[in-house]
Amino acid sequence: MAKSSADDEELRRACEAAIEGTKQSIVMSIRVAKSRGVWGKSGKLGRQMAKPRVLALSVKSKGPRKKAILRVMKYSSGGVLEPAKMYDLKHLSKVEVITSDPSGCTFTLGFDNLRSQSVAPPQWTMRNTDDRNRLLVCILNICKDVLGRLPKVVGIDIVEMALWAKDNTPVVTTQRSTEDGEPVAESVTESALKVTVEKELVSQAEEEDMEALLGTYVIGIGEAEAFSERLKRELQALEAANVHAILESEPLVDEVLNGLEAATNIVDDMDEWLGIFNIKLRHMREDIESIEIRNNKLEMQSVNNKALIEELDKVIERLRVPSEYAASLTGGSFDEADMLQNIEACEWLAKALRGLEVPNLDPIYANMRAVKEKRAELEKLKATFVRRASEFLRDYFASLVDFKFSDKSYFSQRGQLKRPDHADLRYKCRTYARLMQHLKGLNKNCLGPLRKAYCSSLNLLLRREAREFAKELRASTKVSRNPTVWLEGSTGSSQNANTDTSAVSDAYAKMLTIFIPLLVDESSFFAHFMCFEVPALAPPGGAGNDKKSQSNNDDGNDNDDLGIMDIDEADKKPGKNSPDLTALNESLQDLLDGIQEDFYAVVDWAYKIDPLRSISMHGITERYLSGQKADAAGFVRLLLGDLESRISMQFSHFVDEACHQIEKNERNVRQMGVLPYIPRFAALATRMEQYIQGQSRNLVDQAYTKFVSILFVTLEKIAQQDPKYADILLLENYAAFQTCLFDLANVVPTLAKFYDQAMEAYEQACTRHISMIIYYQFERLFLFDKKIKDLMYTITPEEIPFQLGLSKVELRKMLKSSLSGVDKSIAAMYKKLQKNLASEELLPSLWDKCKKEFLDKYESFVQLVAKVYPSENVPGVTEMRGLLASM
């Protein structure tokens, strides 16, 4: 018989090399063929074919316990064994030999930890049954020794396996050395060499008992089939004997049955008695249960009653109105000494009302009659207190103002300007600031009448203060009046033009410095005191006004901190689009309405004294207007805006009147020389520049634009009245405009633009006037020149001498008449230029322009003659230039 692969040492070494590093030792390795039990689709036939594999059993000791693993090895492309799969034998649950294989060499191993039990396990086919038995015996021995249990074995008799193991355990002869070094042969079974795994399936004692049993039947250990037949026959004989014995015991059975029937009757009687007792017990249990239910209900009712009493005590305590608070709310005094008690009563009332509302009170209590009655009582208390407090505050606001009116020293008087001081008034109002907050919480609608009463009273005071202050301010300001129209022809206006009227704008600035911060402070105080939900205000008067800030500091004011902002923190965080903003603006209109008339009176008074002071007042107003950013300063912004509009309107009226005076010059009789309104405009512009403050530059630039536009238009109209002298009038006036405004044009961009425009118009007028003078003295010369130039567009220069009137003879006649006595002609040209010129200072520059223009024209004529009449002699340009230079 061929040698088994289990004895192949090379195969074992190859397996050990494949698992090197795992600290496991190979117990057995054997070649097998792997296949599947169920054929798949025809396209996957290759997967069902048998594949060569090697099964290797390995063990690893972990202290007192061991781990056994079944490894599946496959051959790589190079013929080297490599691990394919690994099964832990502790999960081996079934060993089944396939009965469909006649050879009995195919088996499967079932493991209970496979993820998919629906997939058929692989089938392993051995070369012969000896290899199969050898592998299975080794697996079973390892399971019994290492795991302490055996898997289920199907398809093979385990006794046959044990007998085969006993017959096929080979004896291996080993040698050991004695003490004297000589080897001694020793017989050892293969099972002894396979440490711990080759134990027998049947113990020695069991085998001896089996031999004794077989010896009784005179059957050898190998005659198992005969022994099995013998046992079957004896079993049948025993069963027949049992049936016979049963038939012989019939009388005994009848006796037993009678006894059983008697016992049954007794049991029935006992069952009847037990049923009766059971009914009685059930009734007793029901009675006990009913009693327990009643007791539980009584106990629960007692607990509920106790809890209800506690809750009712709490509700009663919540509904109780303290007598001291009730007295304060219904009939208490509102004097300053009693305000703390009134505030405490308000706080208690607000808290009590909130406590009776559904979010703070259980909805079940909300419908109780006592709660409804108590809520009605609290509402009545609230209405009474709000009515009393409102009446008191209305009278109190009026009394504060009446007290001020009764003291005449409080207002400005003749010879004494009195700065309004509302510190004591605000201090007295602060006493009731917290009361106002609580009134808002109790009934917001009551604030409307209170606000109107406060506005009405304080409006009278503010208007009286502003009226008296403005009146005394105008009376105490001593300054002579400047003309309202600067561009008239009267001499008196120019004499008064240099009068210092700065006191006028200073008076207006003082009016704003005193009253604008006051109005802003009053607006801020009113917004906070009357509980408007608007953002916090900027510092009074806005930024960028040092005088204003100093004035506030002199008053000793602390910016009207009411000391009430900690009552309701929610009021400190309103949005920019607060719904109270519209109501605040309406109330501020009532508070400050009418005071603008006194500001208008100061503006009108200042305008009558010096219209140009409108520029300074406009800048001052704009500076104050840019500083008012707070929402509560809305009316102050409107007031400043109206003042700015009024000042702009009055200044525009002044500009219109001045422009009208300029236009009146158009209707005068023929005018020569520099028109009077040009130097007057220069003086006016110089004065206007001195008055510019802050943002009034745009206002002045607009006036400049209107002035100069009318000035230039009027100048052109006057010049057109006498076309003969139009250019002289234009050049003299445009030159005067440049001379007068040279310094201002260097610093004022708007005037610089008009300066350039005047310069361009001056150059054009000079060119026209000089050309007229030159043509007047040398008309034939330049007329001949013009004819030649006109013909050169149609014919060649060589043909021109043959044209009528342009022959060489005509040229000579023309030169003789024009250039003989040319010095006299030039002198006449100078006299004509000098004759009608009123501004002598312009003569040198005009004469230089005239000489240059004449030389340019004469040089062009000489070049033209040289081209058309090359043989003719004409006086040269150099000769003419020397002649002009000598004169």
From Swiss-Prot:
Region (Disordered): 542-581
Superkingdom assignment: Eukaryota
Biased composition (Acidic residues): 555-569
Any one of the GO CC terms: exocyst
Keyword Cell membrane part of the UniProt annotation: no
Keywords: Coiled coil, Exocytosis, Transport
Listed Pfam families: Sec3-PIP2_bind, Sec3_C-term, Sec3_CC
GO biological process terms, semicolon-separated: acceptance of pollen; exocytosis
Coiled coil: 221-250, 278-315
Physiological role: Component of the exocyst complex involved in the docking of exocytic vesicles with fusion sites on the plasma membrane during regulated or polarized secretion. Involved in polarized cell growth and organ morphogenesis. During cytokinesis, involved in cell plate initiation, cell plate maturation and formation of new primary cell wall.
UniProt subunit comment: The exocyst complex is composed of SEC3, SEC5, SEC6, SEC8, SEC10, EXO70A1 and EXO84B.
Protein name per UniProt: Exocyst complex component SEC3B
Gene name tied to this protein: SEC3B
